[in-house]
């Protein structure tokens, strides 16, 4: 059974359609990255899964049931983009309050505070917390009750690099335990190693969904090969240019060649067999490259101007 099934869903507000025939599934124990510009339909999709909206057309199933089913809500955790708590309560009091509301065991509170790195500040009032600390408290709240499905909306907002890496490691552990996760983010660097698939929305339409290897194959973006310590650099540049490849020198003994149309292995064999390089680096298209490609294909001006 899929954790989430969205079938033929369109969402309208009056005469405005904000989602167009969306079909998207989330498997059990899968992490799906949901990406798109502001107004792409990410928030609407999250609200449909949370049961806060009913689709104008189509069907949404969460854990095999309607999203607003009480049994579903007890098994769902949600971290909103903007986290707000009672400022006069301590971190521990806040988490105990939410545990009671959710029917979760109070014994989880201290464990979760430790898990998100707030044990040292558990008895401080939330009004003294930094934005990053409030974000981590929000994550602890979302993890109450050991949810089967976790929705994370911009979870790295306000986190420093170390806290961000800790969050991704926590996501990895949750995935290993079988938790299904939808991670909605504008911050693309660092995400790709921690998701199973990416879904890219633009203008209310699903532009692409799949693993990064599937999206790379579909997009056909080039792979860049860099070799350093190579002998006869100029002859290699001439050879590849004559063969129709895009190549350039990076220094007196290093070069870069762009591999397109499945030529990566051919170029690597040539380099390793004849060039005797000291080092080779292979640069696959990143999640940012793929995002930009699909945004430009959809005609999103911000991507074309170089802004995510």
Curated annotation (Swiss-Prot):
Subcellular location, principal: membrane
Keyword Hydrolase: yes
Activity regulation note: Inhibited by AMP-PNP. Partially inhibited by N-ethylmaleimide, orthovanadate and NaN(3).
Domain called ABC transporter: residue spans: 4-228
Positions that bind ATP: 36-43
Domain of life, source organism: Bacteria
InterPro entries: AAA+_ATPase, ABC_transporter-like_ATP-bd, ABC_transporter-like_CS, ABC_Transporter_VariousFunc, P-loop_NTPase
GO molecular function term, any single one: ATP hydrolysis activity
Pfam families reported for this sequence: ABC_tran (PF00005)
Alphabetized UniProt keyword annotations: ATP-binding, Cell inner membrane, Cell membrane, Hydrolase, Membrane, Nucleotide-binding, Transport
Topological category with respect to the lipid bilayer: Peripheral membrane protein
Subcellular location: Cell inner membrane
Function: Required for the assembly of the copper chromophores of nitrous oxide reductase. Has ATPase activity. Could be part of the ABC transporter complex NosDFY.
Subunit structure, interactors included: The complex may be composed of an ATP-binding protein (NosF), a transmembrane protein (NosY) and a solute-binding protein (NosD).
Family: Belongs to the ABC transporter superfamily.
The protein's name in its UniProt record: Probable ABC transporter ATP-binding protein NosF
Originating organism: Stutzerimonas stutzeri (Pseudomonas stutzeri)
Upper lineage: Bacteria, Pseudomonadati, Pseudomonadota, Gammaproteobacteria, Pseudomonadales
Gene: nosF
């Amino acid at each position: 059974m899929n954790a989430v099934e969205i079938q033929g869903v369109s969402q309208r507000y009056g005469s405005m359609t904000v989602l167009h025939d969306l079909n998207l599934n989330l498997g059990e124990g899968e992490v799906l990255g949901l990406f798109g510009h502001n107004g792409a339909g990410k928030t609407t999709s999250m609200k449909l899964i949370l049961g806060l909206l009913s689709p104008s057309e189509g069907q949404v199933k969460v854990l095999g049931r309607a999203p607003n089913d009480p049994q579903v809500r007890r098994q769902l955790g949600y971290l909103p983009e903007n986290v707000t708590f009672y400022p006069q309560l301590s971190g521990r009091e806040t988490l105990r309050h939410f545990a009671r509301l959710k029917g979760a065991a109070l014994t989880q509170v201290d464990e979760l505070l430790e898990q998100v790195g707030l044990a040292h500040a558990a008895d401080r009032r939330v009004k003294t917390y930094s934005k990053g600390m409030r974000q981590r408290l929000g994550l602890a709240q979302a993890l109450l009750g050991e949810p089967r499905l976790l929705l994370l909306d911009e979870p790295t907002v306000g986190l420093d690099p170390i806290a961000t890496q800790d969050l991704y490691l926590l996501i990895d552990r949750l995935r290993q335990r079988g938790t299904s996760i939808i991670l909605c983010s504008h911050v693309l660097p660092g995400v790709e190693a921690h998701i199973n698939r990416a879904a890219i929305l633009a203008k209310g339409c699903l532009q692409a969904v799949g693993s990064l290897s599937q999206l790379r194959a579909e997009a056909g973006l080039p792979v860049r090969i860099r070799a350093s310590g190579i002998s006869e650099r100029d002859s290699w540049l001439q050879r590849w240019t004559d063969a129709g490849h895009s190549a350039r020198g990076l220094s007196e003994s290093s070069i870069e060649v762009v591999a397109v149309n499945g030529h990566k292995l051919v170029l690597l064999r040539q380099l390793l067999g004849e060039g005797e390089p000291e080092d080779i680096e292979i640069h696959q298209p990143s999640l940012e490259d793929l995002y930009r490609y699909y945004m430009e294909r959809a005609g999103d001006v911000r991507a074309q101007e170089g802004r995510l």
